[in-house]
């Protein structure tokens, strides 16, 4: 089981990586507790943990990329999409483990948003 920076590294300046490292530690502890309680330590037992954490990392990663994009401005985003204020607030305070597609679709109109990373598989380059 991987958690924190061992699972994925995210921008240290924005401090979101610290939050995700601590939160992933809590999440993995809950997943291990459930697996031990159920007597099932198979990989499938931990898929929910992995999917939730990957989704949270991707949400924060997109927000970090937008933050550093010189053409992006939170004020302009909220002027055009005031109904997304709650989604943006949730994302900024760490409520990352839900669907933020409408928010990031709107942000993509102002900033370049990265494609999702591949997590958990071997990262090899063909030589």
Task: Label every PLM stretch briefly.
Residues 33-127:
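C-terminal helical "tail/cap" subdomain of flavin- and related membrane-associated enzymes
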Residues 1-59:
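Conserved mid-domain beta->alpha element of the FAD-binding
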């Amino acid at each position: 089981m991987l958690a924190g920076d061992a699972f994925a590294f995210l921008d240290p300046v924005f401090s979101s990586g610290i939050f995700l490292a601590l939160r992933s530690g809590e999440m993995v502890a809950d997943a291990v507790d459930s697996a031990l309680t159920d007597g099932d330590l198979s990989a499938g037992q931990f898929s929910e943990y992995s999917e939730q954490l990957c989704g949270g990392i991707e949400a924060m990663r997109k927000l970090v990329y937008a933050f550093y994009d010189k053409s992006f401005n939170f004020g302009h985003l909220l002027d055009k999409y005031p109904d997304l204020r709650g989604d943006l607030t949730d994302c900024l305070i760490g409520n990352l483990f839900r669907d933020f597609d409408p928010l990031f679709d709107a942000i993509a109109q102002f900033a370049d948003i990265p494609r999702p990373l591949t997590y958990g598989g071997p990262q090899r380059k063909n030589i």
